[in-house]
């Protein structure tokens, strides 16, 4: 090896055998670099101005994780100063950055010292000019680099006998360690928050054969229209408003933080297909100020998630207004349950909340029983007129105008109708519902414009179009034929849904019934039109808990900002293609998803395949959502994610994201339960887990070949077996002959649409002890000023105490478990009752009493209801330890680490998986 040249005082050269090069260390600061440090006496080019200082928080995982997962962002010490943007002696350009952006082939998980050298000198503020050479990486900060490097070491853990740390479910995914010159700027936001998009693997295998060999699924998990919560301090999505949209001429990718500028900055090289494109003339021009702009401050070069205001060439017609057609069941069952009264009152109270900033929103109301009741709502009237159509076989509109009206212009008539809608049908004794015909009429009303049909049904459609029969045969439950009940019972609904999708019409279903409603069939409408299904079994508005839950959720749906007439397309680097899609949409072509409406916080899963070997050091995946905002603006939301490539199975396992994997497996299990059987779906989850851990044992650990008493997993997948065990016990998949088909079908709707933040607690509930919670729990505190929750417990009945008060919640329901020996003081302080025996179980409204413990318990309950994205308001149940068997069993079924009926405990499940891994 050649000897290093004479170094400045205080510097030391150390030989790195893995990199086959010297690394230079400043002994006074401990900073290391690959470039030879220059002696101050040597002639150098002028030193550029030092960049602005930035906070030393690691760039990725970003602080937005704290918002997505409700945990405070880690505090990192102050940044280390840097000497400049580039190595001294490197020429400086007016348009900096393109000189040092040539791709560098490099393993994503290289030697510690090697990567440390790449990450030093990168403490640069977001939006600052990019640095040249190795200092052009997207992830700056010495503190970040050190944390990243430690996380890349494959640490193997034996699960047998190990109690899972459930608090780790809130941890961010493994970081994507990109080459240092991957990003064109130094922005901390060049990778998307995982609540928008995440991948099951954060390193891309270079070949399909390597992916097949690893047995790891490769899929994107995304919620591109994620809600912005002020309570979580979520930043708004940056908007590019100047109309300058730079796209690749060949693959049509949007310019993003991972492109390369060439030819003096006049052209940019696509990071997906490699084509050279011209930089738009106005790219460096501030049109508002009419002066040159800083290219490196452009939002699309600094943010992974960005929206472009689309020019007219992205429109095939003027922007669609928000349109809401309400189809309300007014049969005797709907009136008697109180559904109609609550629905009408909620719509009335939500008229000001409906998206209507430009006064273009349109509304129609249709009531259905054994006839169709249309309402004429003229702009100059204060009362609505009703027109009844008894013909249900050939649905027609009784009037060409005033049935679909402008909300602002016809507000008096709309308010008058909603105020007395329930009373109009109060004396009706009609049995039966023509819901299908009502849906068809609503489609005729809004089909030429597009919009949303919101259907509220309280009984099975038994007359007119789309007639359904009660097919919930108890003899099928718990058998291989039960999967028939999870598929549509009438093809009319799927055919109608596809017709709606073609006309930009979405359908939301709100279902209320104490009897069979056939959620599996009616759920086809939201599934293919990008809507959502909501179920309220046994709804009775006389119970305030039922009325409040429905009114709250319905009101949030009505107030939700939505995207209209949308399409989603995912593009990826050469060699990667989309192979399968899961979620609520219609697949218009091989890679184009049609969504008449894009609701907030709805999840989609897209499977990926590697068609051709990947040559580059990193790949880029980009999701584009072309949509019309509910405020009449055509926009493109672009989400860009980059990840390094690797040819190592060990690195694939180290990069795997257990939350994304569990989400993928949930979608695949639901799909398999419908195409095969529930038993096959459960086995599929366990078999896929066994295959992954078998490969890990044989290819990564030293225990290859032969049986082992251990069950080895990488540390980043420590909780994946627990999530798989919980998934097989979930009401949507678990074994048993006592689960009503509607509840199972609805659970499967949630499993395939909930975003990760809500899905994981739905699969693996949260469990807290309240009677002995720490004094700070239930109070405001912490760095972010959020409500502090008690420590999460493992989901096992071993944690229950006869004298205790516990909370179990899965995002849909909250159970307060009260032990039989709870002291009277606890009962008095929480429930305002003298003793345990006076306490009634079931749905409950918890009183907020004038004592500190009641205040803290109520705060914890409120926090669990509000801490996640979505419209859901969990119902609260009080469960006494000696409660009625059905309620008690329901609550205990959430303790997924316990043995349940014929299903094994978590410890037994691990033994089963270990047997598969050992090949026995």
UniProtKB/Swiss-Prot annotation:
Record's protein name: Protein transport protein SEC24
InterPro entries hit by this protein: ADF-H/Gelsolin-like_dom_sf, Gelsolin-like_dom, Gelsolin-like_dom_sf, Sec23/24_helical_dom, Sec23/24_helical_dom_sf, Sec23/24_trunk_dom, Sec23_24_beta_S, SEC23_SEC24_subfamily
Membrane topology, from the record: Peripheral membrane protein
Subunit structure: The COPII coat is composed of at least 5 proteins: the SEC23/24 complex, the SEC13/31 complex, and the protein SAR1. Golgi apparatus membrane; Peripheral membrane protein; Cytoplasmic side.
Binding sites annotated in the UniProt record for Zn(2+): 248, 251, 270, 273
Gene name in the database record: SEC24
Family from the record: Belongs to the SEC23/SEC24 family. SEC24 subfamily.
Superkingdom of the source species: Eukaryota
Protein localization: Cytoplasm; Cytoplasmic vesicle, COPII-coated vesicle membrane; Endoplasmic reticulum membrane; Golgi apparatus membrane
Predominant place of localization: cytoplasm
Stretch list, region Zinc finger-like: 248-273
Function of the molecule: Component of the coat protein complex II (COPII) which promotes the formation of transport vesicles from the endoplasmic reticulum (ER). The coat has two main functions, the physical deformation of the endoplasmic reticulum membrane into vesicles and the selection of cargo molecules.
Alphabetized CDD domains for the sequence: Sec24-like (cd01479), WW (cd00201)
Keyword flag Metal-binding: yes
Keyword tags: Cytoplasm, Cytoplasmic vesicle, Endoplasmic reticulum, ER-Golgi transport, Golgi apparatus, Membrane, Metal-binding, Protein transport, Transport, Zinc
Domain WW: 5-39
Gene3D superfamilies: 2.20.70.10, beta-sandwich domain of Sec23/24, Sec23/Sec24 helical domain, Severin, von Willebrand factor, type A domain, Zn-finger domain of Sec23/24
Organismal lineage: Eukaryota, Fungi, Dikarya, Basidiomycota, Agaricomycotina
GO terms of molecular function: SNARE binding; zinc ion binding
Gene Ontology BP term (one): intracellular protein transport
